[in-house]
């Protein structure tokens, strides 16, 4: 199957400038293509993974990827379908974030070996060497204001107000494509569907300035079956950086994907063949309660992003927490699995009576409730049920002399951190 047709089969092609011409180009030889990543945070997130993995699929098919870090455009801020203008970051912050993004991309694209090894570029390298006058003369003259205002991403901001800085963003992204086309023979740009207006500014500039032929292909912005924007957990982005979203949290995210989305996401986010995914679909529909599709998703994506060791650790944390076996996990694993639960910092020398502790830490609202919970066996310390109303937290309860884990009922966890 032609790589373009496989991408369509996987639901990864949203829009193209010329589908037949692009398919033919991908069939006839190696195509140089690029995807841009503005450093708007210190990590990429799951939303970026669609374009990243699409880029990797093309590389595996023999095409050559260019990964563009937007050191210049990141200083400006893309207005596409944003309700308000982005806060401008300092150069130092953008450089720092850009360096982190470089490291993350190297986990997915092959930068070291092969004729089609990936190339990393930064648009700050060319924008920092062009004067404002030259940019207006050599680039700005190819764009009419009517053309720029016709972009849907701009139309949505006209009534509420858009700064010239953001208005000019599409020309900057268009110039990126022109620079890569001129210097590296890059003829294809890949990006999210919200980038269509900015991306086609590049094909227009290449056509008008050098009479060249270039292509754009957008990948869809992924939503779940309810229409909710994909890639967020409890309203927060699921980051690729393990310090921002732990492998365990990412594992749980995929494990909790709805049945209606699971098989579709296998096509988008894994490198399993379409035949393998079809086999999983059949088994999944026969026994959805076994959650084969979600478990496969979690295994494939966590391993891809963080490695097999992190995946196995996430599985172990999940199993031990489900069984209530707190002592079967290291403090490092517990902190990963219990990130986000209420924490209470205490002095090491404190003698903490269980009743007072439950109230002051907010586990329960009153001493009466605390006594009831302890008497009824609803309170656990490091997995052990506590029914002694006079119980006091001791050195023996400090795991690795660092934390104590309290559980109320089956699911409500609380962590004591000792200073």
Swiss-Prot record:
EC main group: ligase
This protein's record includes keyword Aminoacyl-tRNA synthetase: yes
Localization per Swiss-Prot or TrEMBL: Cytoplasm
GO aspect biological process, one term: tyrosyl-tRNA aminoacylation
Keywords, ordered alphabetically: Aminoacyl-tRNA synthetase, ATP-binding, Cytoplasm, Ligase, Nucleotide-binding, Protein biosynthesis, RNA-binding
Pfam families: SYY_C-terminal, tRNA-synt_1b
Protein name, UniProt field: Tyrosine--tRNA ligase
UniProt short sequence motif 'KMSKS' region, positions renumbered to this chain: 229-233
Biological role: Catalyzes the attachment of tyrosine to tRNA(Tyr) in a two-step reaction: tyrosine is first activated by ATP to form Tyr-AMP and then transferred to the acceptor end of tRNA(Tyr).
Gene3D superfamilies: HUPs, RNA-binding S4 domain, Tyrosyl-Transfer RNA Synthetase
Catalytic reaction(s) noted: tRNA(Tyr) + L-tyrosine + ATP = L-tyrosyl-tRNA(Tyr) + AMP + diphosphate + H(+)
The organism of origin for this protein: Streptococcus agalactiae serotype III (strain NEM316)
One GO CC term, this protein: cytosol
Entry's EC annotation: 6.1.1.1
Organism superkingdom: Bacteria
Residue ranges of every copy of the S4 RNA-binding domain listed in the record: 352-419
Alphabetized HAMAP family for the sequence: Tyr_tRNA_synth_type1
Presence of the UniProt keyword ATP-binding in the record: yes
Oligomer status and interactors: Homodimer.
Motif stretch ('HIGH' region): 39-48
